[in-house]
Amino acid sequence: MKIKNIIDKKNEDLIIALSYVLEKPKSYIFLNANKDLSKENTKKILDIENKLNENYPLQYALGKWDFYNINLIVDERALIPRFETEIIVDYLIKSNFNKECILDIGAGSGAISLSLAYNLKSSKVLGVDIEEAALSLARDNKKKLIIDNVNFIKSDLFENVDQKFDIIISNPPYINRNDYESLDKKLYYEPKSALYGGYDGLYFYRAIIKDASLYLNEKGHLIFEIGYDQKEEVNKLLIKSDFKNIINLKDFNGFDRFIIAEKG
């Protein structure tokens, strides 16, 4: 099979998959359309195509995915890291906030924890998750990337956390009951526990905000990723709990997606 045969299918996910299989940029694929694929790579790409035809997520089909400037193992043990989340990682890394100690609640694959630890060598990062499967994936990624300034523990939110932090960051489950029942088919391959945020999608925001100040140092910051229509409600919860200097950030599509708030 030639590379051109894949290009002719006009399937963007398949092009991305081929770039991962070949470990080459997408430009290489189009500049080398007449090259033959090896038997091994032909089998790999056809296997991936079959999975994509069943609405299986591309990232799971590949088993790996780039996030910020690290490459993660990705599988059904945890939520697929979204490129939008890189916005808040980048913001935090470049901020002048105190960030000696960082807590990531709902660490999942470890994408946020590991990218922060990798880029903030002097910081200590703790990732917590209630799901053993997700923790095993996060630890696999830590081992793969050889990052020493991050640890992962099992904890239901703050249950097993016994210290204070400069930063608490979380991308919690925030899909509400009605929206969950009408999701894209691909999303049902991801763990429900990483997507479903209760009847109104705000369960975890309420729970985290209620206790966050107890685990934040003075001038510490609480950072959330939110659903596109949740800004006002989460802002109200933060204000009610005496958080101040609230900042709202948008994603690449112009939707309200992140909230940063300082401990009051």
State each model region's role:
Residues I87-E181, K186, A207:
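Conserved SAM/SAH cofactor-binding pocket of Class I
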Residues Y228-S241:
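Short alpha-helix
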Residues L62, K154-S155, I226, K250:
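Short loop/edge segments at beta-strand edges and connector loops
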Residues E132, K185-Y215, H221, G227-D229:
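Glycine-rich S-adenosyl-L-methionine
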Residues I239-G264:
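Core SAM-dependent methyltransferase catalytic element
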